[in-house]
Amino acid sequence: MFRHVLLGFVVFLPQLTVVVAFFCSDNNCEECVNSHFIQCRWCKKDNKCHTPGAVATNPCSRAENIVEKSRCADELSRYDPELSYKMLLLSAVAYDRLHPQECLNNSLPSARFQLQTVVTRKCDVFGNECSGYVAVSHALKAIVVAFRGSVKIWQVLAEFVDSLLTPEATFLNGSVQTYWKRGFEKLWQSSMEAEVKALVSKNPSYQIWVTGHSLGSAMASLASTWLAYYNIAPRKNIILYTFGMPRVGNYKYALQHDQLVNNSWRVVNDNDLIPHFPLVVGIPNVLAGPYHHGMEVFYSENAVSVNSTHRECHGKPYNEDATCSFSEKRLSFERHSNYFSIPVGSFYKTKCVRRSALKKNEATQSFKEGKW
């Protein structure tokens, strides 16, 4: 009996594929995503309508597929190394609690960033702090939302223990690590969200650059998703670049983020330990457990600059490409603390000025002091 059913399915499958393809044969985005029978998706890379699961013929990743009419006007996002470097510097500024404006002035002088607010709050029972800031550049027509990474080894341990003992918390339509959500909400609800809303109201055409390193990148992910979900700014204006980001939430959160934030880039150094946290044993599970959102940009060994060898990771599993960072086994804290020759957590000690005389072991020293 079972063999008869299986044989019938095999015979019927090609016909079903043809029928499904028929409903996803529209020639424009609006008609494609408005299909009444199948959730077709439009790919701007080949300007064609595709059926769900058509991995072999659809050149777009999940993050690039368009399934909603409101996104048909979205431009196909591209990884921008120059913008990535700017975002990294802005992430490094977040570590400066005392003089962030001076760091902004020195790191990107021509942008003339104006600091709007800096928020620091205790984000766990051990008294560890989370921090973030909002700034604006009228020269670049950009609003910056940046979050600081962990500043002490005890905070990293608190995050690790929290991920093991505390269930994930609901966030929008998915679930995320409780520590990330708690830190984000304490900062966001204090004044960051209100400041962003005020700036967007005055400058509706400005892009919103959301960024962070390590713990800060997890909170930046939540911020970008929140901005898009609640329509605080047009989705096309929201840009996320993160550096050494841990897994923020589960598969549902990753899927929602990919659908909401089209211009999202998760920059990862080879051998960086933190993107492997929280741990995944075996193959990433789409039904339970932590799962990365897209799009990973993987820098190979000795990436001393933003233009070093790198590639966008479109392999399988989606967002957990087994040929990119998920394949790395020799993990390193130093590769986490240093991106593009910038010791992210301690760069503020130079007042965010690049110096040729910086010691080669500055990144390692940064880790020893807990600045990672």
Enumerate the predicted regions with their spans.
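Structured beta-strand/turn binding interfaces of compact recognition modules in eukaryotic regulators
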Residues: 43, 93, 137, 146-150, ...
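Extracellular Cys-Trp
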Residues: 31-62, 67
